[in-house]
Amino acid sequence: MKTLDRFVVSLLGVVLLVVLATCGATPEPASPPVETQAPATLPPQATTPPLEATAAPEPAARTSIVVAIPEDPPSFNASVADTGYDALVMELTLLGLADLDPEGNVLLELAAELPTVDNGGVVIDEDAWTMEVTWKLRDDVRWSDGTPVTAADVVFTYEAIVDPETGLWVPGIDYVDSVEALDDNTVVIYYNYVYPGYATQFGGEQLVIWPAHYCDPEQGFVAWDCGRQPLSTGPYLLEEWQVGDHMTFVRNPNYHEAGKPGIDQVIVRIVPDPSVAKTMLMQGDVDVYMWATEPMLDDLKDAPNVQVSQAATSRWVMRLFPNQAARGSIDPEADPHPILADVRVRRAIRLAIDVDGISQEIFRGYGQPVWTEFFRPPYLCDVPRPAHDPEAAAALLEEAGWTDEDGDGMRECHGCLHAAEGDPMSLELMTYAEYGEALELAQQLMGEMLNQIGMDVRLSVVEGSVMWADYESGGLEQVGDYDLNLWDDGYSGVDPTDFLWELYYSTAAEPDMGWNITRWINADFDALLDEAYTLDEEYRQELFCQMAQILEEELPVILLFSTVNADAHSARLQGVQSTVNDLVTWNVADWTLVE
């Protein structure tokens, strides 16, 4: 059903730096701060005539907070590189049509109301299975230069995204045929297929609306200057950017919510060393640190002037990706992996790993065991938790024809499905360097556990840019040059449909079409996922739980445990609320200071 026209493929190596930051909280920065140029001039802002000189009350003291991040954001356009730090500053300055609150409820931004079937804003053609979504925009939102935000800005943003030369794939954009402005405050999105994620498609964590009168369409969505010198619709304006040191944001006088933001100034300071940032937080020199790691949380738990906000559920799940195609191949049917193509081996690997032990010992108990994709609201499925049972794991390997007949402690193929007789059960367990020491320690423990059941496991650590680069660039996963990889992944928001497509749909196993890097092909799963593109929530729940059973039986990906989703902040700062649906600054306009 779903065929992605992903002209972003050429940019995949850049886009997938996402995992260096967004695949969980990384203890160390993925790379040195991005080499960028600070804006030569700030964007034009609306001017206000001075008031007549009269006796005025003494002004209130200017309030200011400091947010620490390890590297400069590449830009304010989080759709491009998605390092997390771009989304953090984007939330300070720019709005989309709608976002999500921590409970998963739609939070209107530029939109005046949420279009639904009940209010007539969503119209579905039951025969063609297409839909039209009509958005009504607020009439009181202006760009920071005083220009009203209109439906033309929404059309402009869409056309910039889908430009075949300078555009970028974003989730669900392949379902959109066109976007039309009916008037200044009404825009219609025409879908070629029912798309359940429409509510936050032009909003959420990664996408905002851009100004048609200010951004240069010739420069293109990925590279335009307005991505680094933005006009603001959000609560703050960019006042200064000293690359490698800090960014200064001040209140947006045109912000449409009266009395907000509650803090006059936000300074985003670049602090590459997380231990330095932790000390600054404890000493009161930093007010917010996004993505606090498990060791940092342990160190901060007794600090009297620091509080921790932890999301109610988890987003990032550490997982193993077993390649079902022979190493260097992308065809699991013609060239099955000699070891991992047998589901009994994949099941044995899961049984051999002590998830609780690793989570407690390495990740300080903050992570929780996860064994199904449907572990977080609103879609929960009852899948029994697998046991940690090395003896059962060894028995499965025996059954699969992997035995140790030469007595060296490592198994060889004796009647196995896909390897030659006598071939050793030897494979490589690979992870990425940027996560840091904790993940490498976890990798070592997993290697030891697999060795104990007779698997000869070699460990390797590579740069994420090598692991996740696109096919043309020789990305190890896209070209299939790996055995068993370890990294963390997850999705924002409340709709897992696109995430499931990218990770498990058969078409996504093709190079650069998605992240079905295990090359798992299952027509039954594909059919269920096709059916899930509906607005019938009860039916979607039923479909997802059927998918959960297939994933449990086939184990194309082995889920292990969640990593913590938490942010640390000073006790004087009120209103910080961590969420799996967005970055910590999602509600920055509501933050206040209590001295």
Question: Model segments located where?
Answer:
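Active-site-proximal polar cores
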Residues: 560
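N-terminal lobe/hinge region of extracytoplasmic solute-binding protein
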Residues: 68-125, 231-233
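General beta-strand recognition
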Residues: 66, 107, 132-134, 186-188, ...
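Surface-exposed binding/hinge segments that line
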Residues: 170-218, 242
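Residue-level signal for short, function-critical loop segments
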Residues: 71, 433-435, 564
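N-terminal secretory signal peptides that target proteins for export/translocation
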Residues: 1-5
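Acidic glycine-/aspartate-rich tracts in secreted/extracellular proteins
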Residues: 72-73, 140-142, 194-195
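Extracytoplasmic/periplasmic ligand-capture domains
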Residues: 7, 11, 15, 19-59, ...
